């Protein structure tokens, strides 16, 4: 749930206007607006796992500030591996008004896990981090100029190898977009690594599959199906079809790189490729989307940021993955949509039996 610990309004930046483009009313009578989302694993690992990262994180913040001055900053930034305290410096420099953080180091899983996870031994390779406890948070952050009105998050129950040292999980941030009817749900996540976990591939694959089930369960439990949904993060699926394909038919979203590779769905910045080549498996990072209500969403442009500089250096071992989406709606359809109760009650089991009251906008 949203707390002062998970959601921060940066006071010095409160006067800045949210950067969401309103495209007005096309001749067709439909309305539309656009939103850009950057997902970026910033490699904010603590020493001795990585060196020189404080300087790199500050440089990322400075680059986001430059993009803001030029009027080309992403509307939303999804950060993974934001473990270090210098992430606060990055956020301050970048100029985003709202900052939400995912599962903390001490946060624990609530509710029931996947049925087929009962036989998964939580500690099998203690020499590689399993059973040591959590040394860091999930490292997940959401930065936004549009107001964040609610936050939900949970750690993953299952992990493998060195990944178990971080409290990896998933978070959902609900945003109120100016110029759009209602709100939008945005999910950020980081799933178990493959070889970097330092345990057998079969072990890390099993943990990844169970986390995939947990991710889908979380989304289905917390998203509002009447609102557009955007998903991003480090899925750790590069060259790993056994990870990407697991329960793919049950996903409550479409993967952007797969959607845009169809001739019927052209997206600027992504050339069509042979589907047999499965170009969506060339990156660890994915974005995805879904819409079932009166406001539809689809990707329209793909871009890579924070790649190799002219000097040959990189600020992270990942590129930034930027997707621009278009949200469209017919005002008459929105007005005719069935009214919903002004109050929603959700059970809360994390700290004992309780109820969360949500006042709908």
Residue ranges and their predicted role:
Residues 24-38, 140-154, 165-192, 325-330:
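Beta-strand-turn-beta hairpins that frame and shape the catalytic cleft
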Residues 45-49, 153-163, 191-206:
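Surface-exposed cleft-lining segments at the edges of enzyme active sites
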Residues 17-25, 217-230, 235-360:
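Metal-dependent phosphoester-hydrolase catalytic domains
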Residues 98, 119-126, 132, 147-152, ...:
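Short helix-loop capping/hinge motifs at secondary-structure junctions, enriched
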Residues 2-94, 103-127, 132, 137, ...:
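N-terminal, active-site-proximal structural segment of metallo-dependent hydrolase catalytic domains
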Residues 36-42, 60-88, 143, 173, ...:
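Active-site beta-strand/loop signature of hydrolases that rely on acidic residues for catalysis
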Residues 80, 93, 115, 134-151, ...:
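Conserved beta strand-loop-helix elements of the APE1-like EEP
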Residues 191-215, 239-250:
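Active-site-proximal segments of metal-dependent phosphoesterases and phosphodiesterases across multiple
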């Amino acid at each position: 749930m949203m707390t002062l610990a998970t959601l921060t309004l940066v006071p010095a930046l409160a006067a800045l206007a949210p950067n969401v483009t309103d495209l007005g009313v096309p001749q067709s009578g439909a309305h539309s607006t656009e939103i850009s989302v950057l997902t970026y694993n910033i490699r904010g690992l603590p020493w001795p796992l990585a060196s020189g990262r404080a300087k790199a994180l500050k440089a990322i913040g400075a680059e986001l500030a430059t993009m803001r001055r030029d009027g080309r900053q992403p509307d939303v930034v999804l950060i993974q591996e934001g473990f270090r305290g210098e992430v606060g410096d990055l956020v301050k420099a970048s100029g985003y008004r709202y900052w939400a953080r995912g599962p903390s180091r001490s946060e624990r899983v609530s509710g029931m896990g996947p049925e087929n996870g009962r036989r998964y031994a939580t500690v099998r390779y203690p020499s590689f981090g399993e059973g040591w406890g959590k040394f860091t948070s999930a490292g997940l952050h959401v930065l936004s100029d549009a107001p964040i009105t609610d936050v939900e998050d949970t750690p993953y129950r299952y992990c493998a190898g060195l990944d178990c040292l971080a409290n990896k999980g998933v978070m959902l941030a609900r945003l109120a977009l100016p110029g759009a009817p209602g709100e939008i749900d945005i999910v950020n996540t980081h799933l178990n690594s493959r070889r970097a976990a330092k345990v057998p591939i079969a072990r890390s694959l099993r943990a990844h599959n169970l986390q995939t089930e947990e991710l889908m369960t979380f989304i289905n439990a917390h998203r509002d199906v009447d609102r557009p949904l955007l998903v991003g993060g480090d899925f750790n699926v590069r060259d790993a079809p056994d990870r990407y394909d697991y329960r793919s038919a049950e996903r409550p979203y479409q993967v952007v790189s797969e959607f845009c590779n169809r001739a019927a769905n052209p997206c600027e910045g992504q050339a069509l490729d042979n589907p047999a080549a499965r170009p969506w498996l060339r990156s660890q990072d994915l974005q995805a989307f879904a819409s079932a209500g009166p406001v539809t969403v689809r990707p329209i442009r793909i871009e890579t940021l924070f790649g190799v500089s002219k000097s040959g250096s990189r600020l992270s071992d990942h590129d930034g993955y930027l997707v621009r989406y278009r949200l469209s709606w017919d005002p008459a359809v929105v007005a005719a949509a069935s009214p919903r109760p002004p109050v929603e009650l959700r059970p809360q089991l994390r700290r004992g039996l309780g109820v969360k009251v949500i006042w709908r906008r």
